[in-house]
């Protein structure tokens, strides 16, 4: 009786890994033994970078807001303080988008934040 090696299932499993390794360089896309390691490592990078992406976008939004606010004569932290004082609850994603795409709307928000800071500072000086 011939030896059963579960051939069709093994071939399917190897083919699936090799298809996922398509585009990798050299033997990492040709040989199952190395393609498997490369695909598993790629999955680790994918998982890690899905988590990192959130922080990277937050840093990008902060940089864009900071650049727009500095052009208008405030720092990022003072601007955020002004937004809080003016009870403006816009997140950084929306603020960054406004700073890049709709400067008039951003100017209105900036003016409100600056006014709130001045009112807050004036109240602190009077106290």
Curated annotation (Swiss-Prot):
It comes from the Bacteria. Transmembrane segments: none annotated. GO terms for biological process: ribosomal large subunit assembly; translation. GO terms for cellular component: ribonucleoprotein complex; ribosome. InterPro entries: Ribosomal_bL20, RIBOSOMAL_L20_CS, Ribosomal_protein_bL20_C. GO terms for molecular function: rRNA binding; structural constituent of ribosome. Keywords: Ribonucleoprotein, Ribosomal protein, RNA-binding, rRNA-binding. It holds the Pfam family Ribosomal_L20. SUPFAM superfamilies: Ribosomal protein L20 (SSF74731). Binds directly to 23S ribosomal RNA and is necessary for the in vitro assembly process of the 50S ribosomal subunit. It is not involved in the protein synthesizing functions of that subunit. Belongs to the bacterial ribosomal protein bL20 family. PANTHER family: 39S RIBOSOMAL PROTEIN L20. This is Large ribosomal subunit protein bL20. It comes from Akkermansia muciniphila (strain ATCC BAA-835 / DSM 22959 / JCM 33894 / BCRC 81048 / CCUG 64013 / CIP 107961 / Muc).
């Amino acid at each position: 009786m011939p030896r059963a090696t579960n051939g069709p299932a093994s071939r399917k499993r190897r083919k699936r890994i090799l298809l996922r390794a398509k585009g990798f360089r050299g033997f990492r896309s040709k040989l199952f033994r190395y393609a498997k390691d490369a695909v598993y490592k790629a999955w680790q990078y994918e998982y890690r970078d899905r988590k990192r992406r959130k922080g990277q976008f937050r840093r990008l939004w902060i940089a864009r807001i900071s650049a727009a606010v500095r052009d208008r004569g405030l720092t990022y932290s003072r601007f955020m303080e002004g937004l809080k004082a003016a009870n403006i609850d816009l997140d950084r994603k929306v603020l960054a988008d406004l700073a890049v795409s709709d400067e008039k709307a951003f100017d209105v928000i900036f003016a409100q934040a600056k006014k709130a800071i001045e009112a807050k500072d004036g109240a602190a000086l009077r106290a």
